[in-house]
Amino acid sequence: MEQNIFDYLVEGLDLTAFYSFIDSKTDIDKNTPKLVFQYTTWSALFNGIIRSNEEDDKNVHVFSTNCQYLNDPKEVETGEQYVDMALNGFFGNSGECDDLRHRNAIFMTSFSENENSLPMWNMYGKNGNGVSIGFDLGLLRSHSGGTIKRCLYDTPLNRTLFQNTLSKERISEVENSGDKFQQYLMTLMDFAKKGCYEYEKEIRLTRQVIEAPEYRLSENFIVPYVDNVYPKEIVKKIIIGPCNDFDRSTKSLQGWLHKIGMDHVEVTYSMLPYRNN
């Protein structure tokens, strides 16, 4: 078996605080929400996520986008910065980071713990005219085939706390695994996010994809993605945005869900005060 290069580098390091900090920010086994939400448009709900054709009447589709084509084009740079800090803090250089930097086959899906948030309606819910879809996190985890964690937000406090976990001091009796250390570096790479997005409370699904992706058209370019297929039971709730016509939207949505065998989905309406100019 080929030896991990980090086996030698982490020998004798006390990594307890480093691992504990990352776990405390990203682990979803603590205070686990039952549902996570995606804010989106009616078109994406009707023509992409849930499809009413007979050939696909038992599935829900959730796209994962290549990490280089996310809404924030510099998204991956935050993760690279945290990995650089870790390697410089422990070893005095970040040269061993190159393999992680070029993980172009990582695809991501974003969810939020916020089911009804004004800035989220504004950013992703078509200015309050869209919907917020609640997914069962337990089913999502059991069917995802990837990794699901909370995002680590790069706030001044988090950066300081993180830097305080880094030390070059060696303790002879400590035994470490290079594989484990590299896994935590990958968590930093994939789940660190700019602090200005902290309000999103993002829970992220990441997948490393070997097969050729699909492609879809965005406003500005063609985006590579993979289609994650789940049972329809994964959708538990749909919240209608605050700028929609409440009566007509609710009636037609409930009628459509009944027709396609999804009566289990709770339909509610956002009552947030939203000015849509």
Cite the ranges covered by each PLM segment.
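Partner-binding and oligomerization surfaces adjacent to conserved cores of proteins
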Residues: 1-277
